[in-house]
């Protein structure tokens, strides 16, 4: 309670990890769900970052997973689900920031989770197809292919080509 009061006295909001302490509504402002054990509590907005750590899977599979994932396995945000965090959590020492961005496909992955957070939707929560491309010709496959086209168009215009290394997956057999 003392730390929460101190944080609020500085004009800041209180965010706590979950799993962790079980708070009452109004005690904190938001929870950060960082593992599968983390559960949103009704009345307390939650930020989902479970499996949103880059380099958790294969760098190309991350994009498929993030694009197809429902944030907190909900089809749309609501008062209890505030959004998601994507973290660059690389396993290897990278000499430069640019190496971290490129090696973890930050920009493509960032756009995938941003689209999901902005539009809602998705078709699972990492536990069905996970890193596997949806079946060719399916609604989900076609949506991913459309996303790839738009992503490549934007990234080729606004990102340094050295930081945006991507091979279109929806054309691969």
Listing of model-derived features with the role each one plays in the protein:
Residues 14-29, 33-173:
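Flexible, acidic glycine-rich loops studded with aromatic residues
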Residues 1-14:
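Substrate-binding cleft of carbohydrate-active enzyme catalytic domains
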């Amino acid at each position: 309670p003392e730390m929460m009061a101190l944080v609020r006295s500085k004009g800041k909001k209180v965010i706590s990890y979950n799993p962790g302490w079980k708070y009452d509504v109004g005690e904190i402002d938001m929870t950060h769900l960082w593992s599968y054990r983390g559960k949103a509590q009704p009345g307390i907005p939650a930020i989902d970052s479970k499996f949103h750590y880059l380099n958790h899977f294969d760098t190309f599979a991350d994009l498929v997973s993030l694009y197809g994932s429902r944030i907190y396995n909900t089809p749309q945000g609501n008062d209890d689900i505030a959004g998601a965090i994507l973290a660059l959590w690389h396993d290897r020492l990278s000499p430069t920031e640019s190496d971290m961005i490129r090696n973890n496909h930050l920009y493509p992955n960032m756009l995938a989770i941003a689209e999901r957070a902005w539009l809602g939707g998705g078709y699972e929560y990492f536990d069905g197809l996970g890193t596997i491309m949806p079946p060719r010709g399916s609604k989900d496959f076609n949506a991913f292919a459309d996303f790839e086209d738009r992503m490549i168009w934007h990234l080729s215009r606004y990102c340094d080509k050295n930081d945006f290394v991507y091979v279109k997956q929806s054309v691969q057999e």
